[in-house]
């Protein structure tokens, strides 16, 4: 009497890979390690008839629940780690409850190893809250990604929100929500963002006497109140005073164990992060040398939620033409505060030449993009080596917060106007004109 062979699993890797490609937000963006690949093979993403498990072993039910809990998550969004860890703990608990029935089952043991590997990768604690196995009926009103982060489009499809990035650093250099890059004067107080959810204002002061170049020495951020989530919170930083708390002395907003708004001090007096779950927004503030830098990621639908009277927002519309340094006209005069013809040789800041400035910037930024050009520009116009670190940190913030990797680097190619071009192409011209 012959023994009937079990159904073949030879197609499992292809099936698992195809399913993974249809779920871009399920796993972290880094390449999966071998254990994670093994988990993918065991996830129960296969058709019911491909690899039958004994009826008493419920590993496929555990896996199906885990997929349902994580399919809507966006790895680039605030709160991803917390929600992913909750789902992993729920998955681990489910496997423990079915462990006796699954003893000796390869799929079960692969899943257990994969869960352990993922929990280690994401720094998940074994103890803590777990996700509900009915995620469709659980909504956190103070988590943007729970109540508003997934939008319905035509045909009933759901897509994650579109994020925007804005950054300000150096003399100052502005990267707008549209990825336009500008070098501006904007001396005094100016609004970067002023919408229905968030207000950000910076104050800029002259860097070098007699020059139009300025840099930021004060940042004020207002997280506006939202019912049930947080009271209004104000954060203010000035040179040599970068607090790890709001002006009222608190470090968070909202009730419960998971705060809807909180501050994380990354480097004492030098670098803080603010995470606002209720509006899906992240803000980085740094001090490098005597000046501050700022980087912000915010959902597009919230960033564009403002009244007509709030249209003066540098992150939205860029600097006014009158405030642009790289305006394509009289650039040397704009930078150095002198009235010089373009044929006159203009000296850079003592101690720096184009070659030495380029060498110093290249050590931090091997890619000669607009951040490298900004670094060279700042060294030549101020002589302050701290601006090298500012440009490098600004690029790191882009890589941490900007949602589209292909747009991290911006490359100047020709001279042109501040408002008309998507990037500060005039910056290259400014550097070259100084050495004509």
UniProtKB/Swiss-Prot annotation:
Signal peptide: 1-48
Marked site positions, Cleavage: 171-172
GO cellular component: endoplasmic reticulum-Golgi intermediate compartment; membrane raft; plasma membrane; side of membrane
Stored InterPro entries: RGM, RGM_C, RGM_N
Propeptide: 416-436
Gene Ontology biological-process annotations: BMP signaling pathway; cell adhesion; positive regulation of DNA-templated transcription; signal transduction
Cited Gene3D superfamilies: Mog1/PsbP, alpha/beta/alpha sandwich
Compartments where found: Cell membrane; Membrane raft
Intrachain S-S bonds: 142-229, 166-315
PANTHER family for the chain: REPULSIVE GUIDANCE MOLECULE B, RGM DOMAIN FAMILY MEMBER DRAG-1
The protein's assembly and partners: Homooligomer. Interacts with DRGX. Interacts with BMP2 and BMP4. Interacts with the BMP type I receptors ACVR1, BMPR1A and BMPR1B and with the BMP type II receptor ACVR2B. The functional complex with its receptor NEO1/neogenin appears to be a heterotetramer with a 2:2 stoichiometry, RGM molecules acting as staples that bring two NEO1 receptors together without interacting themselves, this arrangement leads to activation of downstream signaling via RhoA.
Name used for this protein in its record: Repulsive guidance molecule B
Originating organism: Mus musculus (Mouse)
